[in-house]
């Protein structure tokens, strides 16, 4: 069973997160994690953009982690500001975008996933 394509998968516990990470690593897919918080205004601003990128770049796995819900995961990756977008390749951190910076986020996705659908970008 492959990870869902074209959607953002919200992880609500560490087991769920670990399962998604393992599945993506086995499939050779880049994982893009949106570290967010319910109280974070910029996070709410960028969430629909992140969801749009999940549709545009089905070759990657898009995960959403609430830092208050999964503190241990946020601490593992040294997340200190929200939103933080972490790029994981082959189980290791490959890149990071901090802040609701739409263009930087898209450019980093293209860099790691490929320009699969970049021509359809806004």
From Swiss-Prot:
GO terms for cellular component: cytoplasm. Gene3D superfamilies: Glutaredoxin. The active site is at 40 (nucleophile), 43 (nucleophile). Expressed in the phloem companion cells of leaf sheaths and stems. Residues 2-118 form the Thioredoxin domain. Induction: By methyl viologen and chilling in roots and shoots. Disulfide bonds join 40-43. The record marks 41-42 as: Contributes to redox potential value. It is found in: Cytoplasm. Keywords: Cytoplasm, Disulfide bond, Electron transport, Redox-active center, Transport. One of its GO terms (molecular function) is oxidoreductase activity, acting on a sulfur group of donors, disulfide as acceptor. Its main location: cytoplasm. SUPFAM superfamilies: Thioredoxin-like. The record marks 34 as: Deprotonates C-terminal active site Cys. GO terms for biological process: negative regulation of catalytic activity; plasmodesmata-mediated intercellular transport; response to cold; response to oxidative stress. Pfam families: Thioredoxin (PF00085). Thiol-disulfide oxidoreductase involved in the redox regulation of MAP kinases. Under reducing conditions, inhibits MPK1 and MPK5 kinase activities. Mediates its own transport from cell-to-cell through plasmodesmata. Possesses insulin disulfide bonds reducing activity. PANTHER family: THIOREDOXIN (PTHR10438), THIOREDOXIN H4-RELATED (PTHR10438:SF453). Belongs to the thioredoxin family. Plant H-type subfamily. This is Thioredoxin H1.
């Amino acid at each position: 069973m492959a990870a869902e394509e074209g959607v953002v998968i919200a992880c609500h516990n560490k087991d769920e997160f670990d399962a998604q990470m393992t599945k993506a690593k086995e499939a050779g897919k880049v994982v893009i994690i949106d570290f967010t918080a319910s109280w974070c205004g910029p996070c709410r601003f960028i969430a629909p953009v992140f969801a749009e990128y999940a549709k545009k770049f089905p070759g990657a796995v898009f995960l959403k982690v609430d830092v208050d819900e999964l503190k241990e995961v946020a601490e593992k990756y040294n997340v200190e500001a929200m939103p933080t977008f972490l790029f994981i390749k082959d189980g290791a951190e490959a890149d990071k975008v901090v802040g609701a910076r739409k263009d930087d986020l898209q450019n980093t996705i293209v860099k790691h996933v490929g320009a699969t659908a970049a021509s359809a970008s806004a």
